[in-house]
Amino acid sequence: ILPGQLHHILLRGNNDQPVFVDDEDRQAFRQILGEAARQQGATLHAWLLLPNRVHLLVTPREERALAAVMQTLGRQYVRCFNTRHQRSGTLWEGRFRASLIEGARFGLVCQQYLERLPVAMGQAPTPAHYLWSSARHHLGLEHELGLQPQPAYWALGNTPFEREAAWQTRLAEEALAQALAEVHPHLA
């Protein structure tokens, strides 16, 4: 883990089991994630919640920041999930996986991959329709406190409208194949 560098984080459900049963679980996770990132010194750039896994793009400000964020999630979210669903035991498949993302262009390709993945998996017709990712923020449909776009995202245009339109184009179907080919082999 390198401070000041973009990382892709992957958390998988133990034995591919669901880690979210309903929207209340997803909302609780988002709240805990936002607070943990803020308190532990990590900048959250993009996120995706799928039924059995979580993808994050995060820049830690200190060496231990990512581990501290994940530890907070492990303690608080798992306790919340287990209590709500009257279960016990582990929720996650071992330790989180982290991959260093080098280069601004590659960071945007990773974000494109994450925000387009629900469409590729048949979870939504477009990224804008999937409520549990950062795509709606980057497309200008919602404003999410605590989410800070990567510097390369800011370079997509001079105004929010230009950036959002450029991002919409990047999330278009034609761009997906290239993004998948570039990113998939390198993610955790």
Regions found by a protein language model. Give the residues of each.
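A generic structural motif
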Residues: 54-56
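Short Pro-Cys-Gly-centered "Cys-loop" motif that presents a nucleophilic cysteine in a tight turn
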Residues: 1-50, 59-188
